[in-house]
Amino acid sequence: MKHPLIFWKTVLICLMLAGKTGTYADNYQPSYSTAGFYSLSNTGRTIYSMNPAWRFHKGNIKGAEQSGFNDKSWDVVSLPDGIEYLPTEASGCINYQGEVWYRKHFTPEQSWKGKQQFLHFEAIMGKSKIWVNGKLLKEHFGGFLPVIVDVTPYLNYGEDNVIAVCADNSDDPSYPPGKPQDALDFAYFGGIYRDCWMIVHNHVFITDPNYENETAGGGLFVSFDKVSEQSALLKLDAHIRNNSEKSFSGKIVYELYDRNDNRVLSKETNLSVNNGKAKQSSCKATIETPHLWSPDSPYLYKLHVYVKDRAENIIDGYYRRIGIRSVEFKGKDGFWLNGKPYPYPLIGANRHQDYAVIGNALPNSLHWRDAKKLRDAGLRVIRNAHYPQDPAFMDACDELGLFVIVNTPGWQFWNDEPIFAQRVFSDIRNMVRRDRNHPCVWMWEPILNETWYPADFAKNVVDILNEEYPYPYCYAGCDVTARGHEYFPIHFTHPINGGGGAFNTESLDPKISYYTREWGDNVW
């Protein structure tokens, strides 16, 4: 029997491409990042989609990790994949929970020889194991953040190679969210439900922050200070690794382009990295009369980043879209954007990433369409309830002008076993590393939603956030009634619980920013 999601994904993608929007011309095509960046030609870096043609099996099966396993009778699916067809009314935990297997056959291109290869899954639901040619390379716990594997030493050229993935979305209290699905307010729809990429580049390269595990480091980190209509200070941090056999000397070059592809800023800094080592390089640059990002004018620049050797050869490079803006929460003086009090109503909503029929396995176009419809409805704030959402949704919020509250996975559950807290802390670090360059990020919610946790937990998560984002315009929010709320500069209130808003204005702390998060259940 053929996998039923193939038909429904085709229908949905066609509908998304056929739909028109009021903001953009009919021929407009959204731009989606790949693993956090956009490709540039002639940089030695190539991105391959690994989405097509995976063999799929629902259930446990012995020996499926072995490269010689016979999978010819399995269904053929493409990613994103959500395991199964779901009815339009899919609440009540009727989705499948358990092991599923994916296997992909491919032959590496000869041009990959002498380069580095990283396999990048944007997310795999639950706990997962990844094998390449029968070798177990990765075990991961958690369903909402990237899973990245260095496959360079394990590929065989000129012959069939096999990636095998076992994904298990069964209830497991050892990692967040942790709560059994039958008591949860969302579902653990399973599978490899986001995009998968093979990233090929030279052995001297800009790293991936989610792979490197460097506090406030890895990859590219762009932060701002002293933002005004007259000028803005950019702090540019790039983490470069040298996996070649020789020391590297060269430079990092930054070029900033406006919406019309005019170069408005250029900056370079020298770089030397010994073989087998990595180095964080930092510099600052000032842009005069910048176009500032806001919900009503979501202006995006393109920041090109190149690694060049001493002969000016480009060794690696890509670009990111950045928006120059400042966000400040000033207690009783309210929210300020770009140095001025924000004059418009901050109307928003919670958003879950699932959809009728396909569960969590949305194509990028559907994430973008969701953001478009929400913005067209007059919303300016989206809360990613209750987990980091697809990179395509974050890209859309950058482009369409939606503030985003980024949440760590968690909902009304705590496990006293130390491994649970360690995995929460890891999720917080990795969601910041993934999303820190998005101008749409309004604040972070690094706390477990509506959860009773140990007294020191709240302080720990705020400390981790500030370690990972040690620059201006970084804020954390939590419920006003949450344990440890005194460590947070922003408190979420609810009119009917006596916790804030207009119902107890005399007791409000003037240093705290209060935001009425919900007027009713899940309605902002």
Describe each PLM feature range.
Residues M1-N27:
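Bacterial Sec-dependent N-terminal signal peptides
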Residues Y32, G36-L40, Y48, N60, ...:
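Accessory beta-strand-rich segments of carbohydrate-active enzymes
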Residues S41-R45, I61, H304-L374:
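N-terminal carbohydrate-binding accessory modules
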Residues R45-G68, E84, L184, Y188-G191, ...:
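Substrate-binding clefts and catalytic carboxylate motifs of secreted carbohydrate-active enzymes
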Residues V132, Q230-S272, K279-S282:
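Beta-strand-rich binding/interaction modules
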Residues V165, Y254, L303-V305:
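Hydrophobic/tyrosine-rich beta-strand signature of extracellular beta-sandwich/beta-rich modules
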Residues F205-N243:
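Surface beta-strand/loop "capping" patches
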Residues W368-A371, V381-W524:
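Substrate-binding/catalytic cleft of secreted carbohydrate-active enzymes
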